[in-house]
Amino acid sequence: SVAITFDDAYLSVAENALPELTARGLHSTIFVPARLLGRQPNWTMEEGSPDSEEIIMPAEMIASLPSPLVSLGSHTCTHPRLSRIDPAQAREEIAASRSTLEELTAQDIRLLAFPYGDHNSLVVELCKEAGYDIVFSTIPYGVDTLGSEFVRGRVKVDPFDSRLEFYLKYNGAYAWIPYASFIKRKLRL
């Protein structure tokens, strides 16, 4: 199966992607950093990244988005690397983002995407504690093949991917990467 997701709730997603997806009747989920609405991202990006000029959608736009074809999920409050911050701060980022978005949209927020895909077992437990149904990483697995009902993987697709690259990603050609990373980590011990 395929899930269309967008991290960071950039204004360009609302302006460009959503009209095209809606015209085609395709559902998508936007993961929102709840306390950065209407601002430029405060996180570090690669030099020359097209995202460096982006603006996060303002609150009014986020509030108007939920529909049968557009769902919202949490992307924490301020987009930190959750495994690298104090557990109390991580708990606040995870829980407050959900409550902030629920208050703004009057929708039940049940999904979270980890900023940078960064998580550990404590972060996963904090997400369960906060009441999320499913959380997403950037591990390059299909959405239904990570082996966990709670933590799901995703494969990043970029606008500049060739048709071949898209085909390979769609068909799981990069599913070996987590295994290689695991082995590499074990060999360092």
Over which residues does each language-model region extend?
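Metal-dependent polysaccharide deacetylase catalytic core of the NodB/CE4 family, i.e.
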Residues: 1-2, 11, 22-120, 149-152
